[in-house]
Curated annotation (Swiss-Prot):
Molecular function per GO: GTPase activator activity
SMART domains linked to this entry: RhoGAP
Membrane-topology annotation of the record: Single-pass membrane protein
Species whose genome carries this gene: Dictyostelium discoideum (Social amoeba)
Protein name from the UniProt record: Rho GTPase-activating protein gacU
GO biological process annotation, one example: small GTPase-mediated signal transduction
GO CC terms, sorted: cytoplasm; membrane
Coiled coil (residue ranges): 627-685, 1057-1130
Role, per record: Rho GTPase-activating protein involved in the signal transduction pathway.
Bilayer-crossing regions: 279-299
Comp. bias intervals (Low complexity): 22-32, 393-418, 545-579, 676-697, 729-766, 853-939, 964-976, 996-1009, 1024-1048, 1140-1158
Length: 1164
């Protein structure tokens, strides 16, 4: 029975009632016009009666017959016709909005039926951008969008896969579930946008840009959740991008895009957990089987010798044959269903007739009989991934004792027979491999001569279609008869395979090929039994010499006389499978885009190859696969457990080694502390608020040096540049990230420096290790010292350039590997290198001639020789020595740790009271005791950043003791990055000493200046320690610190308080304006280049503004520090006058006021 073709033009199914509605003839011709299809012939009066167009469901518009012959609303057809006619090359099409007033007017005219043709539309508005905006407005105002609300979540989930073939196949399946009105309009819109994207050279609207514009318009969630819309935006744009790029495949059911990299495989995701998807799969399979119940018209000449010319003409004379796209005016190709002689080949390279008649005479006895039977069943049940269109009508096998004649005849059946067709994927190679037997035996595919040379070949698939089909006719009387009369043995096999068995076998093979799913059994109604299991395919990439030709791997259906052979072969194959099956699923290889030359198809070649090569002639052997999978999973779990155990053992060994090292180091420290018995500290009153660790011991005859902070995980230097001026024994402790303490005893004589480099190497070569190895190599080539303190300015500049180069190489390699520049978290591994870069840069600033000149000019008294703790002279030599030899000295050491305020009152009747308030905020991990020289180094010193000292040492640990003055022992020609001559000593003394000259009291004000990073504001923490004596009073007040590199500090101190405030407000305003300009430049740079300002070359256009901005920052910090100095000095004077009035009777007392003032500056 021949059925009429079902298209949108002759039937319509009402979604609400389910009834079929036949449209009127006027609706069919409504879109055509006498001028060539410009618009609809429906009168405006009729359109007005039909009602509005915008904001109306598409189903209602279609039922009202408000569509044209292309099954799209008239407003869409009018606008698309104008675009195709004259606006394909207009720049910014669909992106540039039109006039909103005109847009609303056009909407009103369409709703009132005043626009019936595209000429009417052009008369109302000829701006193509306004018309394009009207098209988007129509789609946007649909109550149910083109991608309906009910399928929104399914579309979003289908785009979550990383494999493009899975995304495209899933999208095609979901598009088939759209209502027919939505599907028709979406197809028309995708075709229009596809044509627009082909003119992207002129209109600048690529498929990606169009997807961004139309994605939110055609697809939106039912509840407008802003967060959900933002999260799903990339999926929405990606789905519509596939709609445009894969138009031919998605909207033409039997036509695939010519891009061979896209396959038709539709994989089931989460089938066990999602029964709906499983139902969709069977719905899709039913769509393939639906052609079995139809009877299309075939060629009139069924003979196997039909010529190609007759074939082409017969196909052209069959207008209703096969499947035709619903849009006849488009360029979609036809995909015909026919037998092998009716295949239309679009390739010009194939001009030969297909002849599948094979007559072979071989004297091979019973083995040929079995081989013939294998080949017959292979063609019935086994499907090769490279096969072209294959037609099988009848197979006859006759084996006689005298002459063995194997006649394989392929004949066309009559037109009234049913047909089952199935679509199969092929490989991505341009020329599929022909299916031919591997032995010189008889074959239905070609003619083999006596020498075993294959003379015949099947027709390969047309190059325009990367898909092949298998056509099997209804063979109710298919007989596979094999007669063997040799030796009195008569074996008659009459296998009658009906149509039902054939379809059942094809369904099983379809599942195994397309979906990696093997069905255990099917009922007569082709229903799936319950509790079916999914069997993943195997990866045979590691199996060697098991991929033979497609025809050599066969699946046989043997009779009862061959049961023993079947059992033996199955046992052997099981052993082979247990030894050769890989543990990696092919889904893993597909997800990671791993291709293999042995894989002839991307659907599931591994499973088919194993089944054909190992499971001999029996599909029931698939039942053994779950056991094999269980064994594989158990092996994987065992291997994982073994690996975890090995890792745990390695970690335990490492921890044990670290503990042993720590114990050894502690023992060494203990031994050294026992040897240093001559180290003593005379303290009559010890108020120790310092924690037990770290312990800091001070030696009277030891100069204190603070080297630069070594980079973490890198070479650490144990010597300071000041050590050549002292003959002593150095006991150094350096802490690296692996907690390895190396004690180096170095004997330093005059100018002998012993540098011990402790290299911390990691097991894996991370970028940091590679960078430091490169830097070490560059230093050796340039013959530079590894200690940056001993480098000259030129060497420091070279070191800075080398570090910068390594940092840029890290950024470049990161971008090459991950496709983007590293973020802040990604750069964390390179933090030690950044720290070293800042240290080198600070040394360059300190050692530059301009910086040295300014610092020397601002300092009043610099020691010409290094001053150690054993020196009895104070730093300020203009004053006489106030520390006479007294036999009774009370050293009040107040060690205040962790920012605690301690007030100690000690009533003493002696003449000389030395009150030393040591405020310790220690970030270091250890401090070593030694006889003569104590060198402090810690991994946390880089946080102090260029601390300065004028009369006392300021480092990670504040140190005080005795009547000995404390000073940095840096030589005059070498400047440390953390200890430099102070620029604010004179300004502070000028601000304080003019109120401290009362009677004969000698007040020595020692100010400790701590430098921190700028820009900063002031938050002063005062540490007060008052000592009330009957003969003397000493007060220690907290003062602020100033930055050594602040320019013109002494000039600022000459200004009045109001002038300083005005200057501060003015400079801050200038800095703010410059900051806005620089921020604007950064924003424009990011928009233009797609990245932030990162390199020096990027700042060239605003280099002057950038330098000015840095100067203003330094000036603001200096002004802030001066203002805080004045404020704190006012408090100091108030306290000093109060104490001075209480001590007028003590005119011959020597008061040493040691003011250790620490001010913590925080960032703005």
């Amino acid at each position: 029975m021949k059925s009429s073709k079902k298209t949108l033009t002759n039937f319509w199914k009402d979604p609400s009632t389910g009834n079929l509605v036949s449209p009127s003839p006027s609706s069919i011709n409504g879109g055509a016009s006498s001028s060539g299809g410009g618009g609809s012939t429906i009168s405006p009066t009729k359109l007005a009666k039909e009602g509005p167009v915008f904001g109306v469901p598409l189903n209602d518009i279609f039922k009202r017959n408000s569509t044209n012959v292309h099954n799209v609303p008239n407003v869409i057809w009018h606008i698309s016709s104008n675009i195709r006619q004259s606006a394909m090359d207009v720049e910014g099409l669909f992106r540039i909005p039109g006039s909103n007033t005109t847009l609303q007017l056009l909407k009103k005219n369409y709703n009132e039926g005043k626009i019936g043709t595209k000429d009417d539309l052009n008369d109302k508005c000829d701006d193509i951008h306004t018309q394009a905006s009207l098209l988007k407005l129509f789609i946007r105002e649909l109550p149910d969008p083109l991608f309906t609300f009910s399928l929104y979540d399914s579309f979003i989930k289908s785009h979550g896969s990383k494999d493009k073939s899975i995304r495209v196949g899933s999208l095609k399946m979901l598009l088939g579930q759209l209502p027919i009105a939505h599907f028709s309009l979406l197809k028309f819109l995708a075709e229009l946008l596809r044509e627009v994207s082909t003119h992207s050279v002129n209109n600048r609207m690529t498929s990606t840009n169009l997807a961004i514009v139309f994605g939110p318009t055609v697809m939106r969630p039912q509840t407008e959740d802003i967060v959900k819309m933002i999260e799903d935006a990339r999926h929405i744009n990606g789905i519509f991008l596939l709609i445009i790029d894969e138009y031919e495949f998605l909207f033409n059911v039997m036509y695939i895009n010519r891009n061979r990299n896209i396959n038709i495989n539709i994989y089931l995701w989460k089938s066990k957990k999602n029964p709906k998807i499983s139902f969709q799969f069977w719905n899709f399979l039913f769509f393939i089987l639906v052609f079995f119940f139809e009877q299309p018209t075939f060629a009139n000449n069924p003979s196997p010798n039909t010529s190609r010319n007759n074939l082409n003409s017969s196909v052209r004379q069959s207008p209703n044959k096969g499947f035709v796209s619903s849009n006849p005016n488009r360029k979609a190709s036809k995909f015909e269903f026919s037998v092998v002689d009716d295949v239309e080949n679009n390739s010009n390279d194939i001009n030969n007739n297909i002849k599948l008649n094979t007559n072979n005479n071989n004297n091979s006895g019973k083995s040929q009989q079995q081989l013939l039977q294998q080949l017959q069943m292979q063609q019935l049940l086994s499907i090769s991934p490279n096969s072209s269109v294959i037609g099988i009508n009848q197979q006859n096998a006759n084996n006689n004792s005298g002459n063995n004649n194997n006649n394989n005849n392929n004949n066309n059946s009559s037109n009234n027979q049913n047909k089952f067709s199935i679509l199969l994927p092929v490989n991505n190679h341009p020329q599929p491999t022909l299916l031919a037997p591997s032995s010189p035996s008889s074959s239905i595919y070609g003619r083999n001569n006596s020498n075993g040379i294959n003379n015949g070949a099947t027709s390969p698939l047309p190059p325009a279609s990367p898909r092949s089909s298998l056509t099997l006719l209804d063979m109710n009387h298919l007989n596979c008869g094999v007669n063997d009369y040799s030796g009195g043995y008569n074996n008659n096999i009459n296998n009658s395979i009906g149509n039902n068995e054939l379809i059942r076998g094809l369904i099983k093979k379809t599942c195994s090929i397309l979906f990696d799913k093997e069905l255990t059994s099917l009922t007569d109604g082709f229903e799936i039994t319950k509790d079916e299991t999914f069997i993943p395919a195997f990866d045979t990439s590691n199996i060697n010499n098991h991929h033979s030709s497609p025809t050599s791997n066969s699946v046989n259906n043997n009779n009862s006389n061959n049961n023993n052979n079947n059992n033996n072969s199955s046992n052997n194959n099981n052993n082979t499978l247990n030894s050769d099956i890989s543990q990696i699923s092919p889904r893993f290889s597909r997800a990671n885009e791993i291709s293999s030359a042995s894989n002839s198809s991307t659907s599931s070649p591994q499973l088919r190859s194993l089944l054909k090569s190992h499971v001999n002639n029996n599909l029931n052997n698939l039942n053994n696969l779950p056991n094999l999978l269980g064994n594989l999973q158990a092996q994987q779990q065992q291997q994982q457990q073994q690996q975890q155990q090995q890792q745990q053992q390695q970690q335990q060994q490492q921890q044990q080694q670290q503990q042993q090292q720590q114990q050894q180091q502690q023992q060494q420290l203990k031994n050294q502390s026992d040897e240093n018995n001559n180290v003593t500290i005379n303290n009559s009153n010890n108020n120790n608020n310092t924690p037990t660790s770290p312990v800091l011991n001070i030696i009277n005859n030891a100069p204190i040096t603070i080297p630069s902070s070594p980079p973490l995980n890198t070479v650490t230097s144990n010597l300071s540049p000041s050590t050549p001026y002292n003959e002593s024994n150095n006991n150094n402790i350096n802490n690296n990230n692996n907690n390895n303490n190396n004690n180096n005893n170095n004997n330093n004589n005059n100018n002998n420096n012993n540098n011990n480099n402790n290299i911390n190497s990691n097991s894996n070569n991370n970028p940091l290790d590679i960078a430091f190895s490169h830097l070490e190599k560059v230093r050796k080539e340039g013959k530079r010292n590894s200690d940056i303190n001993l480098m000259s300015i030129d060497e420091l500049n070279e070191e800075k350039s080398a570090i910068k180069k390594e940092l840029r190489d890290f950024d470049t390699n990161f971008k090459r590997q991950y496709g983007q520049l590293p973020r802040k978290n990604d750069k964390e591994i390179m933090r030690p290198l950044y720290i070293r870069y800042r240290e080198v840069k600070s040394l360059i600033d300190l050692k530059s001639p301009q910086s040295v000149t300014s610092t020397l000019s601002n300092s009043s008294s610099l020691p010409s020789t290094p001053i150690s703790l054993s020196s009895s002279n104070s730093l300020n030599k203009s004053q006489p020595s106030n520390n006479n030899n007294n036999n009774n000295n009370n050293n009040n050491n107040n060690n205040n740790a962790n920012n605690t305020n301690t007030n100690n009152s000690n009533n003493n009747n002696n003449n000389n009271n030395n009150n030393n308030n040591n405020n310790i905020n220690n970030n270091s991990n250890t401090a070593n005791m030694s006889n003569s020289t104590s060198t402090l180094s810690s991994s946390g010193q880089h946080q102090l950043e260029r601390a300065n000292s004028s009369s006392s040492i300021t480092s990670a640990a504040g140190i005080g003791g005795g009547s000995n003055s404390k000073s940095s022992t840096s030589p005059p020609n070498v400047v440390s990055p953390y200890i430099s001559p102070s620029t604010s000593f004179n300004s502070l003394t000028e601000l304080s000493n003019h109120q401290n000259n009362n009677n004969s009291n000698n007040n020595n004000n020692n100010n400790n200046n701590i430098d921190t990073s700028a820009p900063m504001i002031v938050d002063s923490h005062q540490y007060n320690s008052g000592n009330s004596n009957s003969n003397s009073n000493s007060n220690s007040n907290s003062n602020s610190s100033s930055k050594s590199s602040s320019p013109n500090i002494t000039d600022f101190t000459k200004l009045s308080l109001n002038e300083l405030k005005d200057r501060y407000i003015k400079v801050k305003g200038e800095k703010r304006s410059l900051q806005i300009d620089l921020h604007r430049y950064q924003s424009e740079f990011t928009k233009k280049h797609g990245r932030k300002v990162q390199f020096v070359e990027d700042r060239v256009p605003v280099q002057a503004e950038y330098e000015k901005y840095k100067e203003l920052k330094i000036e603001i910090v200096a002004l802030e520090n001066i203002l805080v100095l004045i404020n704190n000095n006012h408090n100091h004077n108030h306290n000093h006058n109060h104490n001075h009035n209480n001590n007028n009777n003590n005119n011959n007392n020597n008061n040493n006021n040691n003011n250790n003032n620490h001010t913590t500056l925080y960032h703005l």
